[in-house]
């Protein structure tokens, strides 16, 4: 299918001073779009933390939050108000602040961060809800949600109902502050295959609801920080394991370089684990005293997240393609995103009717994943731009019997027909892709789909963009095409039959084909009444008849007398 020239470029891009890719919006629109997205994230955030219900997938929320920060930086706006933390209803102070964790983009960033740091360990980044556990005199006295890192909700009554969390401790842990992740216990969870399952939202929902004490049995705890604990990491892990926090010991590995981090990351991505993860965390054994911990200032640890299975992508344009059969397909051009090491910059939406149902316009944010064979797939629209500037689709008068001859309105279907006839399913013209056909047609102004047969070697050589070797190859391919059997030429003319049916017909000339009745076509493999009627319509089409006479004049096998 070829792209329709009339397309809507609704969102141009520019690079900000920070290097971010920015939409080229007027200031008023930028302010409006930022405010709308900020409010939507705040609403989702409020529902999530107050009701324990996720109105949007965790990954989508995270990516849209990052998109908001990007936009704010583009216009030089303060990003401190971005709603990435829960609304502050809780007033219980954390004895030790939650620092959060810096995100590293790739292995190179990991190598750079590790440089100059020693005694490093890696842990899975368990996907759940962060909590502070406070033990005093050997008993669990308080459990506090992360909140804004300084204060949060008092979750003590709920946490005491979770069987996997020790209610008593001894030794150094008798009086200790622990930070960790409450997670949904899984049996044999393989992250690469099963994904995130919205685990974070499920955990939050269980902790927020008042009538689900039995559901808390499915929750576990992974301790990732013991502020002011033993300086020696093996000793720290051993004591945690003895106290009942065994997962920390099992899933904390010493690492010396980025290669070891990468191996652990890949292993945990593909192995069966008891929890959902979204990456790994690298941390130094040596940590500052807890009184120095502040939100956003934990420079002794960093995260390397897994690439998301689906990416939020920004629609930059809507394009229309017309195939050889006249079918119009809508394609969304995207600001490029990376999925499974594949650069994705366009996704097929489908028919015009489906596009209208999706209501997608340039500037919208859509969720894209990879379907079978790595083909980009549209999953959902996660955010719509305020401005709904949509292009007008081309006229829908195209069909399987239009555009065998070139015209202004037939440009794209005509090119599609040329690409088809050059494919291995028809004449097998090696090296003749869409770009080559466009160059020849634009230079020599083909009258119909077989006009290229009349080109001379000099004309091909003089086509802009064709090197000597390429023009000679094309000339050879065009000459070889003349020797192709009759059935290949009929396929090139887009007869509505399969190759198997055409071979079964036994026709080896245009004269034989003209003698066939509709009843004859019905008897061929995979050819019912409807298709047989289409064959008759195709054969009797004036353009097809004219092309058959033209091919006869060119002495193509099967078309002469």
UniProtKB/Swiss-Prot annotation:
UniProt xrefs under PANTHER family: DNA LIGASE, DNA LIGASE B
Gene: ligB
Gene Ontology biological-process entries: DNA repair; DNA replication
A molecular function (GO) term: DNA ligase (NAD+) activity
PROSITE patterns assigned to the protein according to its UniProt record, in alphabetical order: DNA_LIGASE_N1 (PS01055), DNA_LIGASE_N2 (PS01056)
Transmembrane regions listed in the UniProt entry: none
UniProt xrefs under Pfam families: DNA_ligase_aden, DNA_ligase_OB
Keywords: DNA damage, DNA repair, DNA replication, Ligase, NAD
Family: Belongs to the NAD-dependent DNA ligase family. LigB subfamily.
Catalytic residues in the record: 125 (n6-amp-lysine intermediate)
Name assigned to this protein: DNA ligase B
Role of this protein: Catalyzes the formation of phosphodiester linkages between 5'-phosphoryl and 3'-hydroxyl groups in double-stranded DNA using NAD as a coenzyme and as the energy source for the reaction.
